[in-house]
Design a protein with these regions (language model features):
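ASCE RecA-like P-loop NTPase motor cores
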Residues: 1-179
Length: 179
């Protein structure tokens, strides 16, 4: 069972009060736990897992194009030839933040040939990708708090850090049409 409900702890829409000529700016606060649950629900649907989604009215608002979102994933498999720098670049495109100090959801860190990724859909688990040159040598899952390895994996798919990512070609095309 997954949840796809409104992720706002607080939401103040923008408003204008003509009587006092006052503009009230939009303000909001996003609940990190609910955001993680929304990402987990999206991942489970796209991976065709048997899943029940409990949703609120917020699910009727568009998340964008499914094909575009799916294009933005990064499949990683043991034995794949891909440069670590390319993976770092792709993670940044997926709105993951490189952070060596504060390893939290939707971040990654690099130590030599080791890349740690804290997926947007996990609460307490992360992935360690070990490279030998430009080849993925191993992938493991570990507890993000203790660092203890919990599983050896053959492959993983990294999903975007949030639902509002756009592939570069679509972004370039939109810019041309706006001009």
């Amino acid at each position: 069972v997954e949840y796809f409900v409104s992720y706002y702890d607080y939401y103040q829409p923008e408003a204008y009060v003509p009587k006092t000529d006052t503009y009230i700016e939009k303000d909001s606060a996003i609940n990190e736990q609910i955001d993680r649950m929304r990402n987990a629900a999206t991942r489970n649907i796209l991976e065709d897992n048997d899943v029940i989604i409990v949703a609120s009215v917020s699910c009727i608002y568009g998340l964008g194009d499914v094909e575009s979102y799916s294009q933005m994933t990064i499949p990683l498999k043991v034995g794949d030839e891909i440069s670590p720098r390319e993976v770092h670049r792709r993670l940044a495109e997926l709105q993951y933040e490189r952070n060596q100090q504060n390893f939290v959801r939707s971040t990654f860190r690099v130590q030599g040939d080791i890349l740690d990724i804290f997926p947007a859909h996990y609460e307490d688990r992360a992935w360690r990708i070990s490279f030998f040159g430009d080849e993925i040598e191993s992938i493991s899952e570990f507890d993000s708090l203790t660092g203890k390895k919990t599983a050896d994996l053959k492959e993983v798919t990294v999903y975007p850090a949030n639902h509002y990512v756009t592939p570069r070609p679509a972004l370039s095309q939109a810019i041309v049409h706006i001009k």
